């Protein structure tokens, strides 16, 4: 029984191991990937992910607004938008279908995983979409470089 469980866990690890990347991997590949900051905070925290992003983010990171980039005509928060809207959002962010992407957040609500799910749902290759283990908190704890520069992106053509 324990051997079977270990084999199942190993199979899952082999299949999905690139979904989570560590800070050293990102630091070594920072100019080879697109980086998305998807920080979102519960309203009662009175924190604003975008304001925090403008003050400090991982170099080259593009901000993804989880509120604005979700379906807006519903009372339920953060519902998936329609495919055409998703294509426009990604295209405006300069994301292309073959881009390797690392997503992180600066929150305790794992909003980066929501963005990861959206990308996979709309057809981005799961092997090209990663979540940064520990997010911005771990990045800063390890004294890695942060930035406050506005990232300028070229519009791309993204297809879902």
PLM regions: where:
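Flexible, polar/low-complexity N-terminal or interdomain linker segments that lie immediately upstream
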Residues: 2-50, 137-160
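A general structural signal for stabilizing positions within well-ordered secondary structure
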Residues: 52-55, 121
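Structural recognition of the beta-strand scaffold that forms the well-ordered cores
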Residues: 36-37, 63-65, 102-103
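Conserved beta-strand scaffold positions in the cores of enzyme catalytic domains, especially
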Residues: 35, 61-63, 129-131
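Anionic group-transfer/hydrolysis microenvironments
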Residues: 39, 67, 107
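Aromatic- and Gly/Pro-rich amphipathic surface segment
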Residues: 54-93
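Short active-site-adjacent helix-start/loop capping segments
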Residues: 43-46, 70-73, 109-113
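Thiolate-centered catalytic microenvironments shared by cysteine-dependent enzyme domains
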Residues: 77-160
């Amino acid at each position: 029984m324990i051997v079977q469980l270990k084999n199942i866990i190993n199979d899952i690890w082999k299949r999905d191991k690139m979904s989570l990347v560590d800070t050293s991997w990102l630091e070594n590949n920072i100019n080879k990937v697109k980086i998305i900051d998807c920080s979102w905070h519960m309203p009662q925290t009175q924190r604003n992910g975008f304001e925090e992003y403008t003050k400090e983010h991982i170099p080259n990171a593009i901000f993804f607004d989880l509120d604005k980039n979700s379906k807006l005509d519903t009372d339920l928060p953060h519902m998936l938008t329609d495919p055409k809207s998703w294509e426009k959002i990604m295209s405006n962010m300069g994301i292309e279908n073959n881009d390797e992407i690392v997503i992180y957040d600066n929150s305790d609500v794992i909003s980066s995983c929501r963005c990861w799910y959206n990308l996979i749902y709309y057809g981005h290759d799961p092997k090209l979409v990663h979540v940064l283990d520990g997010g911005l908190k771990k990045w800063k704890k390890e004294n890695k470089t942060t930035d406050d520069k506005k990232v300028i992106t070229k519009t791309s053509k993204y297809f879902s």
